[in-house]
Amino acid sequence: MSTAKKPLLEVRDLKQHFPITSGALLQKQVGAIRAVDGISFDVYPGETLGIVGESGCGKSTTVRSIAQLYKPTSGSVVFDGIDLVKADQKTMLKARRDIQMIFQDPYASLDPRMTVRSIIAEPLVIYNNRKLLDKPLSALDIERKVENLMERVGLNKAFKNRYP
């Protein structure tokens, strides 16, 4: 990727370790599970990142750590210029509007009763209804955003009324 473009997402030396404890009452840490141990990568505007690997290798933990659903043990996650590891709750809520995760099983992630358009529009509609967007979106605004997102990831707009 050209160095002239700035990454949209920068992950540096991300680590997510979970403590192993012994004893029921006075729990003492006796070790740690190193679920994610020092990964780094960049994602540039227009790119899509797929994380693949064996079951239990840390794919979901990596994504949850990036989205700050788990507080990383160490490392940095910078999304659109915002250091998510150091972000306050309000900043994190705003950043999560732009972060999308689709986990391993597409049949569990994508509702087969919803059209592609409805699936893509769902977060926009929820945030719009809860008045969490900077400005309210009309139905036409949402439709345009759905088509723009489909175009950005290489999905033909003709698929928007199909089911996954």
Which residues does each PLM region occupy?
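The feature captures the beta-strand-to-loop junction immediately N-terminal to the Walker
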Residues: 52-53
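Conserved ABC ATPase "signature" region
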Residues: 83, 128, 137-159
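ABC-family P-loop ATPase nucleotide-binding domain
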Residues: 1-32
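Helix-to-loop junction immediately C-terminal to a conserved catalytic motif
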Residues: 67
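Short helical segment in ABC ATPase nucleotide-binding domains corresponding to the A-loop/adjacent helical element
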Residues: 107, 113-126, 143, 147
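Conserved ABC transporter NBD signature motif
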Residues: 75-83, 95
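Conserved post-Walker A/P-loop segment of ABC ATPase nucleotide-binding domains
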Residues: 46, 70-78
